Amino acid sequence: MALFNVEGWSIKTKTVAFDNKTNKSSKDKKKNNRKNGKLTREQKLKEETEAELKEQVEDIPSEGSVAKDIPKKNQEKSDQNETSKKRKHDEEAPLMQVKENIEKPTKKQLTPLQQKMMAKLTGSRFRWINEQLYTISSDEALKLIKEQPQLFDEYHDGFRSQVQAWPENPVDVFVDQIRYRCMKPVNAPGGLPGLKDSKEIVIADMGCGEAQLALEINNFFKNYNKKAKKYLKRRHKVHSFDLKKANERITVADIRNVPLPDESCTIVVFCLALMGTNFLDFIKEAYRILAPRGELWIAEIKSRFSDGKGNEFVDALKLMGFFHKKTFDENKMFTRFEFFKPPAEIIEERRQKLERRQKFIEVETEKEELEKKRRKIAEGKWLLKPCIYKRR
């Protein structure tokens, strides 16, 4: 196959023919030189254009250069303002931090187990304070609260949580009574009792707690007098007494001896407040400060009455000089009583009736027997049982 024989490409040949470097033509060299020349020219043009751009950019005024061109006076003023602001900020910063710390105290969220433990502790603390107040006299209770004022707040925190579970709050019942009876004229049948001359309704809340009764009554009469005609407006005053001044409405006092003159009140309220072992002294004080035909309103927990209905309690208050009006026992948790202080003419009529029936001596002996019994055993142990919660 001579036609396909190519020099250097024969399979049979032992040597392979390679291209020789020296055999390159001068044309190839010229082409390479031209290409290199073009590259150098393009690089030079690029470098020149970049240099021009740099010069143009440098000629444009920057923010720093503009700031340098501002007059020195304005710059000095701005510097002074900035330094004064910094000083004020530095001085006010710690004060603001203190305020924030006071206004926003860090509160750690308790776990469910910790919440249960806290509830048990507060409950046991409330029960202990409650037992103390029911089993000591009023002067001892006043001394205790003066020495440890935090006990008053702890007790009322626990008491508030207890009453919230009740179907009805006795304070609300008393406020509703005042609202309802206020619609009738003062001293009229079914109306509220007022002082004889001024017809002012004067209420004494004995053992007021946080004086919620005074707050609600004041708000009611304020709104009532705004809408009422001039001749229908009501004059009123509320005195609130307890062992600690929890707010401005309260006067600190032992409620067996309050700073009020004789016959200066028309309604005296004991709302779950007959707590001391000497609570009949509170009743005597109520009789002293009540005006004739003034009313005594009492609400007490049902479990305190040994007979379940409070008949023995009513009889004891009759011996103290009060006339019984009505007992309200429809509530599951507490019983309400209404008494009034008879005027002198009714007392005289009653005395004459008892003499005709030859029972006056019997009544006097019953009073003496009651006082003798009180001297031996405090009425807080037999007439009204202390409200002591079961230990768990």
From Swiss-Prot:
Changing K390E: In RRP8-1; no effect. Synthetic lethal with GAR1 mutant allele lacking its N- and C-terminal glycine/arginine-rich (GAR) domains. Residues 1-96 are annotated as: Disordered. Residues 27-38 have a biased composition (Basic residues). GO terms for cellular component: 90S preribosome; chromosome, telomeric region; nucleolus. GO terms for molecular function: rRNA (adenine) methyltransferase activity; rRNA (adenine-N1-)-methyltransferase activity. It is an enzyme of class 2 (transferase). Residues 32-61, 344-382 form a coiled coil. S-adenosyl-L-methionine binds at H156, G207, D242, D254, C271. It is found in: Nucleus, Nucleolus; Chromosome, Telomere. InterPro entries: RRP8 (IPR007823), RRP8_N (IPR042036), SAM-dependent_MTases_sf (IPR029063). The modification Phosphoserine is found at S62. It comes from the Eukaryota. It catalyses: adenosine(645) in 25S rRNA + S-adenosyl-L-methionine = N(1)-methyladenosine(645) in 25S rRNA + S-adenosyl-L-homocysteine + H(+). Its main location: nucleus. Belongs to the methyltransferase superfamily. RRP8 family. S-adenosyl-L-methionine-dependent methyltransferase that specifically methylates the N(1) position of adenine 645 in 25S rRNA. Required both for ribosomal 40S and 60S subunits biogenesis. Required for efficient pre-rRNA cleavage at site A2. Also involved in telomere length regulation and maintenance. This is 25S rRNA (adenine(645)-N(1))-methyltransferase. It comes from Saccharomyces cerevisiae (strain ATCC 204508 / S288c).
